């Protein structure tokens, strides 16, 4: 479909999902997120040719939460390559994103890098190689998004850190199996700061556009990941990016994706575009009600899929 049609499609989708904005529930287990107005929506496409299309609350920033895990993995792969997979797996979990039972059963090796335990151990790996992990993460998002003012919402980071106990339990459990190198609380502080980075949908789609462009940032022309690793990362996003709703998302949307409890969803159509959508009301799986519906509509209207 010609890119000139994208704007009208996004406008139509924004109107069609409007009745869904009152559905779902914001993530109230993180006090700072519980204060967000649930009836907000934005969606943006950033193409591999550098075109931007957006509808809804395009300039509204939000914390990206678990969508940051994709960049954590990217930075870790840059520094470890395949060595990283000795510490974290590549399989779908089929359980809740913060499950301790599965982690115990599999002797401290998380199923994949997108469940909490997997992201935390990936963050631990980064912590071992970076002197200033939060600075590196911020600078990466600033460079890839084109916004040098990207910042961390410290209120959200502090709120998540205060209620870190289950995530801390995962870290200590992995440490008991010899799969954790640094102080758990130090790593969690970095992890929650990554989650509390604020972008809008345009910035988010642009920052991750290298996933649709064979690993190359099309603004700078610099390679972020080798082409093969980019394909592998997209494969993991398809199988595990939406936790135990990944299969349903793959069936309905047909693209690799990653969600976050702020109501953010990122999706990738290789060689075409990245799309970011945000709407805070969540379903029982912790995914955005309007966001998932919007991406399904996009897939149908453009007749797109990776298959």
UniProtKB/Swiss-Prot annotation:
Catalytic activity: L-glutamine + H2O = L-glutamate + NH4(+)
One of the record's GO molecular function terms: glutaminase activity
EC supergroup of this enzyme: hydrolase
Entry keyword Zinc: no
EC number: 3.5.1.2
Residues holding substrate: 66, 116, 160, 167, 191, 243, 261
GO biological process terms held by the UniProt record: glutamate biosynthetic process; glutamine catabolic process
Top-level division of the source organism's lineage: Bacteria
UniProt keyword annotations, A-Z: Hydrolase
HAMAP family with a match to the protein in the record: Glutaminase
Protein family according to the UniProt entry: Belongs to the glutaminase family.
Protein name: Glutaminase
